Amino acid sequence: MTKADTIFKENIERILKEGVFSEQARPKYKDGTVANSKYVTGAFSEYDLSKGEFPITTLRPIAIKSAIKEVLWIYQDQSNSLEVLNDKYNVHYWNDWEVGDTGTIGERYGAVVKKHDIINKLLKQLETNPWNRRNIISLWDYQAFEETDGLLPCAFQTMFDVRRVDGEIYLDATLTQRSNDMLVAHHINAMQYVALQMMIAKHFGWKVGKFFYFINNLHIYDNQFEQAQELLRREPSNCQPRLVLNVPDGTNFFDIKAEDFELVDYDPVKPQLKFDLAI
């Protein structure tokens, strides 16, 4: 059993046994009913990517390529346009969060990255002094929230640090998330930010180090309890999945493509589970 599978099962059990039910929930299912959830607060996990520990479960298939494409949309294109996401990347799951008829998700995610020139500033800081302790991506922009409607960012802060070990520089990353759907989005969010970490490391020719993941509200929706029990019953695959970025060291951050990533030794348990998502 991989570390990710162990953490996955432990988190499911913790939510089912110790969790409390949400009140006055915002999300709704497609039929209009309120999407309540059972949740715990303060969930933390740690993976040493340099030792082959990756935050992806083998208990069900996880769509990695579309998750990586979303990261490129946010941090390379720096866009909130659904047309860009649909046409350039063939990713459509954000369409349910379109704001009115704007063709966008509001001033969120990529729009905030562009507004504050976040990626260029981050890369410049890391180039000038990798050991500075201010390498932070923050998507939490109150002014943007007041200017337009739109889903507030779930994965909203990423911090980066470097370590020199035996002459090699390792890039560590910490992802902070306000809210996370444990069964559906947990490993998607984790792996897409591992991909971002790998892109930045490649830009500088560094090694990937540790990935730290903190979630404030970790939940299972009230229509997912059957799937949760099924996941607990499943025996994990014997594979040891890892994400590989097949570009030379020093490749410019903005030149990396989704096709450059390869998920190696991934043979998840099937069949895939079905989930009715909360919007």
Swiss-Prot record:
The keyword rRNA processing does not apply. SUPFAM superfamilies: Thymidylate synthase/dCMP hydroxymethylase. It holds the Pfam family Thymidylat_synt. Keywords: Cytoplasm, Methyltransferase, Nucleotide biosynthesis, Transferase. One of its GO terms (biological process) is methylation. It catalyses: dUMP + (6R)-5,10-methylene-5,6,7,8-tetrahydrofolate = 7,8-dihydrofolate + dTMP. (6R)-5,10-methylene-5,6,7,8-tetrahydrofolate binds at D181, A278. CDD domains: TS_Pyrimidine_HMase (cd00351). It is an enzyme of class 2 (transferase). InterPro entries: Thymidate_synth/dCMP_Mease (IPR045097), Thymidate_synth/dCMP_Mease_dom (IPR023451), Thymidate_synth/dCMP_Mease_sf (IPR036926), Thymidylate_synthase (IPR000398), Thymidylate_synthase_AS (IPR020940). The keyword Methyltransferase applies. Homodimer. Belongs to the thymidylate synthase family. Bacterial-type ThyA subfamily. This is Thymidylate synthase.
